[in-house]
């Protein structure tokens, strides 16, 4: 297990470990960990911290409310954190910008979980200091909107309906893209849900330029292309795989 081996390596060299997990709807692949994978990860962390080694699990859950499995499945994963050893600090990084589609406001929150109050007492001032010195304050408008929607029953119910509609729309776009990819023979990395689908590519920069000439914009990364299905229509999701495949095949 590569994660387990890396944790052991860092534990020896650093005497402490920080692990960042972006799940569900991983950016950029759309991979999502199963409940069994989360159980295995918790076991690995507990094994590494049996001797009291300080460990921080930073859980980047920016896209958590777009998991196609629904609310209960994602919260069931989080409840596993109760099994973590005392030397583990779990930090949940929530993005209101994603969940509530408030991208321009960049609003989010951190929730720290630990079995020892002393760990939280140490984390809180350090967190406040680092956040205030780097970013000052979150926007008042963003904080107001999040609290207003979540604390007002009428708004909250309407929001839940809109969120479900957005999630269903993403699922439909993803299914269309993946189905068409199979038809044209375009390979994609394992995808479950999310805003992005990733296509393996040996020359991403060259393929990106070819696609731009056809007014198609994807993001070239290392050995892959990231397709943002959150930003394109259902019809475009059906059309893109063929265009991307043609652009990639020019290198063959």
Where does each model-flagged region fall?
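PLP-dependent class I/II
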Residues: 1-252
